[in-house]
Amino acid sequence: MKELKGSQTEANLLAAFAGESQARNKYTYYASKAKKDGYEQIAGLFLETAENEKEHAKIWFKLLHDGMPDTMENLKDAAAGENYEWTDMYAGFAKTAKEEGFDKIAYLFEAVGKIEKEHEERYLKLLANIENNTVFVRDGEVYWQCRNCGHIH
């Protein structure tokens, strides 16, 4: 099979993934607004379409990654993405917004950047738990609640 990396097809897959992902979010926002406005049927159609877009995005994601990466790889990727967002992206966006006189937008970029830092830290802690085999181990007595039925163990 030909090498996908660096090809126009890879660029197209990235664009398709981004487009479908953005459409999914947009349609969920539209669904919320339609529901708030009293249009249940329209809200339902937006949500249905959002789920379709999610599945389309998943097709492109899997092709880009030769399948679905394992959880450790996903945590590493998520942490790296969050790190970029809080160290480079939002910091740079805030600086530009301030320079252009958009102080409120700059504040929002900075505030979201702080949240992204917390996201990175959370992913790194979860990754460490897997690496140290402590996902299901805690000191002292612990109660576990079933995420499906709610039973407490």
Regions found by a protein language model. Give the residues of each.
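Non-heme di-metal
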Residues: 1-153
